C-alpha cells in the first residue's frame, strides 16, 4: 500500500508533498500490482488533537486532507480504507463514536471528489462488536466495504486444533451484524486487508496456514485477501520472501494456488471426507480443483472414486493415484471425477457440520475432559501440548495449569453474534496437594472482552465442585480467536483439575 497518510502529505498547513507517493504508485503500476489507500493520521502541526489520536477536533483539516488525496489519486486509487485496525492506533479514551465521526467526514469528502471511489470501514482482528458500535454511533450508510485483520483466528487454524468453523464463520458473522444494524449494506464486500502467520512453528506451518486461509476465505466469500507480508521487513518474520529476497514454502504455496485456482477462485462447494474432515472444490484454471486436509491433528483416507492428481502446494510436486492419506498439510487435487463435483455443488449451501452435528437448535454445548474426552459442540484451544490429560481421584480430568488460561470456543451454529443469556457451568477440583486454586471467567460480550461477575475459589480437593456463571450480554464473534477463558491470573492459582464445562442457553431474562 502506498503511503497516503495525512502527516506524510501535508507536512505544513497547505503545503502538499506528492513526490514519494507518486513514485510508489508509479512502481506499483509498473509491476501491474493493484493497490488501495489508507486515510489515516494527523500531522504534527495539528495541535487540536494529541499525537496518536483520531483527529476529531480538526475535522475541517481532516476533510480537506481527504479531499486533496482522493482528488490527487483519482483514476489510480479507488478503494480507501479509513484508519488502520481501529481501535488500535487511536487515543486510549477514544470511542467508536469518534471513529464514526471521521468515517462520516471522510466518506462525504471523498464522494464529493470521486463519486466512484469506495470507502472501507475498518476494525482490528475480527472485532465485529466495535464495527457494530461504530455503525450505531453514526457511520450507518457511510461505507462501501468492510476490512478485517483476523490474525488470531488463523493462528488457531494453523495450530490444527479444529477451529476451521471459526474461520469459516467470519463473513457470515459480518453479514449477521450488518443485516441487524445496516440492512442496506448487508452484502457489501468483506476484505482481509491484512492476514498472515509468522515462522514461530516453522516455514511449513506458515505455508499451510496460507493455503487454508485463502481456501476458506474464498469459500466463505471474502472479496480479497492481502497476505502480510510479501517480504520480511515490517515485523514477523512473516514474509513470503525472507529479508534477502529468498522464497519460503509460503511463496511456493501462493504460486501453486494461483496456478491452479487462478487470481479469483470460483467456489463450487464442499464434500465430506469422512468424520469431521471437509474438502473445498473450486473451478480452477484447467478444471475443478479440490483443496483438502484433515483437521484437528487427525488423518483420514480420501478415495475419490477414480485416479486423480495430487499436488503438494508447498513444493509443487505431483503424484497420481486412486487413494490418499490426508493430514493437517493441505493438498490440491485435479482431474476430479464428475460425481465428486456434482456432490460438492449440491452441498454448497448446506451446513458443513465440522464437529459432527448440527448445533443450530441445541440448547447447550459441553465438553468432558480426560482419557475419554467428549466434545459436544464445545472445544478447548489449550491443546494437549499445554495441558495433558491426567487421571485424578479415580476419574478423568484435565490439568488447569494452562499458560494464559483454559480457552474455549463454541460451535458457531450454536451461537454466533446473536445475543442470548448463557449459563456456564464448570466442574473442577483442587490438585492432590490441595493448593489454593481458582479462576475468573473471561468472555466475549457486546462491549468486547469482559470478566464475569466473580472470582471462583475452588474450596478443596475432597470432591468435585461446580462453579456457575451467568452471562447476560455474551456476543461471540471470535475476534481474539476464542469465546471463553478460565484465567487464574498467572501460575499461582491454576493448580486444579477440570472435569467438564457446559454452556447453556437461558431463556428467562432477569
Predicted features and spans:
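Noncatalytic carbohydrate-binding groove/subsite architecture in carbohydrate-active enzymes
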Residues: 96-214, 220
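Aromatic/acidic polysaccharide-binding cleft in carbohydrate-active enzymes
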Residues: 196-259, 268-277, 285
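Carbohydrate-binding surface patches
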Residues: 272-307
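C-terminal beta-strand-rich structural cap/linker in extracellular carbohydrate-active enzymes
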Residues: 319-356, 470
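Extracellular ligand-binding interfaces
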Residues: 401-475
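Substrate-binding cleft and catalytic face of glycoside hydrolase catalytic domains
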Residues: 1-154
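Glycan-recognition and processing domains
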Residues: 344-415, 502-504
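Extracellular beta-strand ligand-recognition surfaces/modules
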Residues: 466-500
Amino acid at each position: 500500500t502506498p503511503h497516503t497518510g495525512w502527516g506524510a502529505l501535508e507536512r505544513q498547513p497547505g503545503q502538499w508533498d506528492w513526490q514519494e507517493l507518486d513514485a510508489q504508485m508509479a512502481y506499483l503500476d509498473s509491476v501491474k500490482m493493484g493497490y488501495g489507500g489508507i486515510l489515516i493520521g494527523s500531522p504534527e502541526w495539528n495541535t487540536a488533537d494529541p499525537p496518536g489520536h483520531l483527529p476529531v477536533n480538526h475535522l475541517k483539516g481532516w476533510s480537506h486532507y481527504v479531499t486533496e488525496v482522493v482528488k490527487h489519486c483519482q483514476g489510480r486509487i479507488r478503494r480507501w480504507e479509513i484508519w488502520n485496525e481501529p481501535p488500535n492506533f487511536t487515543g486510549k479514551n477514544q470511542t467508536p463514536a469518534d471513529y464514526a465521526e471521521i468515517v462520516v467526514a471522510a466518506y462525504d469528502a471523498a464522494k464529493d471528489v470521486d463519486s466512484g471511489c469506495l470507502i472501507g470501514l475498518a476494525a482490528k482482528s475480527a472485532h465485529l462488536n466495535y464495527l457494530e458500535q461504530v455503525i450505531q454511533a453514526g457511520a450507518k450508510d457511510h461505507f462501501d466495504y468492510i476490512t478485517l485483520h483476523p490474525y488470531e483466528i488463523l493462528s488457531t487454524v494453523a495450530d490444527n486444533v479444529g477451529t476451521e468453523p471459526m474461520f469459516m464463520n467470519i463473513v457470515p458473522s459480518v453479514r449477521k451484524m450488518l443485516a441487524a444494524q445496516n440492512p442496506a449494506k448487508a452484502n457489501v464486500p468483506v476484505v482481509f486487508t491484512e492476514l498472515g502467520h509468522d515462522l514461530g512453528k516453522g516455514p511449513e506451518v506458515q505455508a499451510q496456514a496460507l493455503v487454508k486461509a485463502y481456501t476458506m476465505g474464498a469459500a466463505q466469500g471474502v472479496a480479497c485477501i492481502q497476505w502480510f507480508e510479501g517480504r520480511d521487513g515490517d515485523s514477523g518474520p512473516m514474509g513470503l520472501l525472507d529479508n534477502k529476497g529468498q522464497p519460503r514454502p509460503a511463496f511456493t504455496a501462493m504460486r501453486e494456488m494461483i496456478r491452479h485456482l487462478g487470481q479469483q477462485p470460483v467456489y463450487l462447494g464442499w464434500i465430506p471426507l469422512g468424520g469431521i474432515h471437509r474438502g473445498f472444490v473450486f473451478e480452477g484454471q484447467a478444471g475443478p480443483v479440490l483443496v483438502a486436509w484433515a483437521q484437528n491433528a487427525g488423518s483420514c483416507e480420501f478415495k475419490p472414486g477414480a485416479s486423480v492428481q495430487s499436488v503438494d502446494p508447498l513444493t509443487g510436486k505431483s503424484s497420481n493415484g486412486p487413494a490418499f492419506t490426508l493430514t493437517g498439510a493441505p493438498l490440491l487435487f485435479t482431474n476430479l471425477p464428475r460425481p465428486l463435483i456434482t456432490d460438492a455443488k449440491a452441498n454448497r449451501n448446506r451446513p458443513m457440520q465440522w464437529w459432527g452435528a448440527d448445533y443450530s437448535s441445541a440448547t447447550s454445548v459441553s465438553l468432558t475432559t480426560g482419557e475419554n474426552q467428549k466434545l459436544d459442540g464445545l472445544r478447548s484451544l489449550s491443546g494437549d501440548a499445554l495441558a495433558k490429560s491426567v487421571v485424578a481421584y479415580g476419574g478423568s480430568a484435565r490439568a488447569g495449569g494452562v499458560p494464559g488460561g483454559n480457552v474455549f470456543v463454541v460451535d458457531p451454529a450454536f451461537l454466533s453474534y446473536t445475543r442470548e443469556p448463557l449459563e456456564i457451568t464448570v466442574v473442577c477440583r483442587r490438585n492432590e496437594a490441595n493448593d489454593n486454586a481458582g479462576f475468573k471467567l473471561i468472555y466475549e460480550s457486546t462491549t468486547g472482552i469482559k470478566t464475569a461477575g466473580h472470582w471462583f475459589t475452588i474450596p478443596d480437593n475432597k470432591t468435585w465442585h461446580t462453579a456457575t456463571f451467568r452471562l447476560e450480554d455474551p456476543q461471540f464473534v471470535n475476534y481474539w480467536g476464542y469465546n471463553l477463558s478460565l484465567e487464574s491470573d498467572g501460575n499461582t492459582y491454576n493448580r486444579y483439575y477440570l472435569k467438564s464445562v457446559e454452556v447453556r442457553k437461558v431463556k428467562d431474562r432477569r
